[in-house]
Amino acid sequence: NRSQHTTEEALVSDPTAQPQYDMSVVRGFAISALVWGIVGMTVGLLAAVQLAWPEFNWGILHFGRIRPIHTNAVIFGFTLGVVFAGSYYGIQRLCRVRMFSDTLSRINLWGWNAIIVAAAITLFLGKSTAKEYAELEWPIDIAIAVVWVIYAINVFGTLAKRREKTMYAAIWFWVATVLTIAMLHIVNSAALPVSMWKSYSAYAGVHDANIQWWYGHNAVGFLLTTPILGLMYYFLPKQAGRPIYSHRLSILHFWSLIFIYIWAGPHHLIY
């Protein structure tokens, strides 16, 4: 847009100028994270009550439908909302440039929240693949892949035009999240549709179980761990008023997590 081009022209003429960062997408995801956090935790409270007092399982509002609404709202609505907000905030400042595309940022914001709304509605209606943390049916899975690719283009486009040569540790962790979640989602969600809201997994038996918990384990690792570590590496030194103790240790931390964590999914199948 015009303001973005004006900012870039000013930076070319004066390399020391402070870029105008896009804060609207940060605010948007922060607000949506709060909303989904409240929704998810309220539904989670109902699920906990239903476990303790089964008489609170009312009709279609039973535990089997309430629980996946809770997990999807908290993981993909609340936590990922925080991750999106934090990464959009941090990447711009660590690269010292505005995000690659304001339009892609808006599509990411509104597209992702539309996906969470669609997830809540379809799960409430009983439309589910019955795969934990991957319950959503194939039309929503495709939408997730599209919006995630848009986020990836925005991130890598920003990195390509960055004005800071060194990529700080936080960016490494966010990039790992972008790449790994795309791979996990596409492989685990491969399915054969038989109707608009019904599909069967492309895998069978023990292979399906192994792939599902390779995904489930790494959803924890690359949605709830690596991006949060990225936020920690960015905000902790700022709050402490001191630089990170060792950039080399942070890179060792990163590669240790990448090489060890991703292969441990089958332990979820040991009972």
Identify the function of each model-found stretch.
Residues 1-28, 55-60, 200-208:
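Extramembrane terminal tails and long inter-domain/linker segments of multi-pass membrane proteins
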Residues 11-22, 149-167:
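Cytoplasmic juxtamembrane interface segments
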Residues 132-136:
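Segments that form or flank anion-binding pockets
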Residues 1-3, 104, 163:
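Intrinsically disordered, low-complexity sequence elements enriched in Ser/Thr/Gly/Pro
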Residues 208-211, 241:
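Functional cores that coordinate and move charged inorganic groups
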Residues 27-55, 60-127, 138-159, 171-196, ...:
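Hydrophobic cores of alpha-helical transmembrane segments in multi-pass integral membrane proteins
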